[in-house]
Amino acid sequence: MKKLIALLLACVMVLGLVACGGNETPATEAPAADAPAAEGKTAADLKLGFVLGSREHAFYCSIEEGILAASEEMGFEAVVLESDLDGAIASERIETLVVDGCDAISLSVNDPTASTPAIVAADAEGVPMFAFDCTSSETDVIKCFVGTDNYQGGVVGGEATIKYLEDNGLTDGATIGIIGYPEPQSCIDRENGWFSVVNEYEEKYNLTIVNLGNYKGDATTAESLMNDALISYPDMAAIFTVGDPACVGALAAIKSAGSSCVMIGFDANPEAHEAILDAENGKIWIADVAQDPYQIGYLIAQNMVSYCVDGTVTDSTILVSPYLVDASNASVD
């Protein structure tokens, strides 16, 4: 009998949706594309529009760096806006970029229900639409999506969790947990990937697996969830979080409680690298699943140019592989 225990805890803050991607396996051949929107143009003639989730997140800032690097290298004009993780604002940004004369537009579809109508409307006006980090399953007009293989990232996190237990002799009745965010598809995929691994060891290692709750992308909420979990499960051995903000909050709770619980996060933002390498925090925040947002930004821009110039994309879905960061490969610029 599974010991999956859901803690229903109140959340005091609600933020908008964060990054979300897919876990589909990309096709082996580039799909046929419609006629490009800017026939006869070269890369240097193009004006391309981009809508980030929020510059408050280091992840999106790195995506923007990749976009701007592609702009400098290829010569197109990049107009980069942000949606503050709000679908209604994302829709307004799309309309602004259409009016501004962009040859193609790409966005992180953090709220598909709210922003898909604007995506479809822009496509109907002849502006090719692309997506990065998070796409929409509610329309088929998106020419190309570039994002992280989030399910595989969850698998990496699950494997790291089990390895920690094995390396530290905690394979007989340990308690492990997860802080989730079951709204963005990316975080759902990460959670499912993690469970696919740890559930295989539940009976073998007599694990107690605890779902700490939904942190809603907010570090303060994550701290509260972790505080409550440590009261109920003071011997918690390890947790996995679906985003680094959850680790930031959980770290504070673990230190305050004097717990020996360790954490494995997801994103590998700069604060994760710093914590992993820190003499004290690194004893708790031991690893993180890394994405490559710079590459995501560069690749989506590259495919937008390709589509506008000759009507092709590398693939309709391009997934960037995640990897584990720990003390052996973490770095601080």
Task: Please tell me what each predicted stretch does.
Residues 13, 20-333:
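A residue-level marker of the well-folded mature domains of exported/periplasmic proteins
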Residues 8, 17-18:
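Intrinsically disordered, low-complexity terminal regions enriched in Ser/Thr/Gln/Glu/Pro/Gly/Ala
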Residues 1-9:
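Positively charged n-region of N-terminal signal peptides that target proteins for export
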